[in-house]
Amino acid sequence: MAESHYSPGQLIWLKLKRNRTAMFGLGVLVALYLSSFFAGFLAPAHYATQNREVSWHPPQLDDLHLFDAEGTFRGPFVYGTKRVHPAISEYEVEPGVVVELELFARGDTWSFFGLFESDLHLLGWSDPKRPIFLFGSDLYGRDLLSRVLYGSQISLSVGIIGILISMSLGMFLGGVAGYFGGRVDFALMRFIEVILSIPGLYLILTLRQAFGQDLPSTQSYFMIIIVLAFVGWAANARVVRGMVLSIKENDYVTAAEALGVSRVNIIRKHILPNTWSFAIVTATLYVPYYILSEVALSFLGVGIQEPEASWGNMLKDAQNIRNLTDYSWVLVPGFFIFLTTMAFNYLGDGLRDAADPRSKL
């Protein structure tokens, strides 16, 4: 069927589906955001649950078994471990002790965005005193798998909320500047230049110091989003302005003006919709910047604070060289940061190619 039979959105989707790397990135992001959304159910334990007796327990993902020593199928299980010495984080396997990995097990109570509470988890273990650490544990004996899942709620949502705010501001103010021109354009462009001169990360560091080290994690979370969105919209607005300067010269805009359509409706119905392809592609490519900014700030200790979990403050354990050499699983959050960034870049590149009117279906 000819391309003229499809809407612009359908054309972009059809082109995107043919890009395997872009679809791979989309699939990874869907999986990550779904697991983040249902983190309380998927996580075996609460992110703050501690057990100092099993601090720095190595990952047991490779130690999962399906058959016991006699060849009998038992489902997924691990052999129990015991600490070699109370002062040393070394463990030895107890072959005679079997700890089963259970599905739909009862455990710590979690809340689904304040709507309801439950203690049902997708994964659990048969012996509450012998937890199974698939990704290992940290200094306080907290399950890294659970903290990665809970941490994704903060790290992944920062990117989405931040880009929604910055793109909305950028498209609106850029559209206003480009359409009205004159003094409005001049004033907005000078304001944008001021915003572009503000270093976002340093502004957050300054505000964090001004508010003190006791700032709750919730307030730090919103401060990071607001500041990053405040300094991020200006670059988008400048690009949208340039697009609007070209779009407003089209015949359909002139016809709408001749028919007496209000300027606000012209911008909303005829101009901004023509910038959506740019907005979608830009948003996809910019989300990793917001995620990495939160990670960097939490890694430096000025973002999300303990005991809350975010991928950034989980990586703080990697600042210690001994931790890196002895407990390499502290880098597990880094793998998910890399995976997320890679997926967004793959998807963004695919969307950019699909939105290109010169590309063929």
What are the residue ranges of the model-derived segments?
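Gly/Trp-centered helix-boundary motif
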Residues: 1-167, 171, 260, 303, ...
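Alpha-helical transmembrane segments of integral membrane proteins
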Residues: 137-361
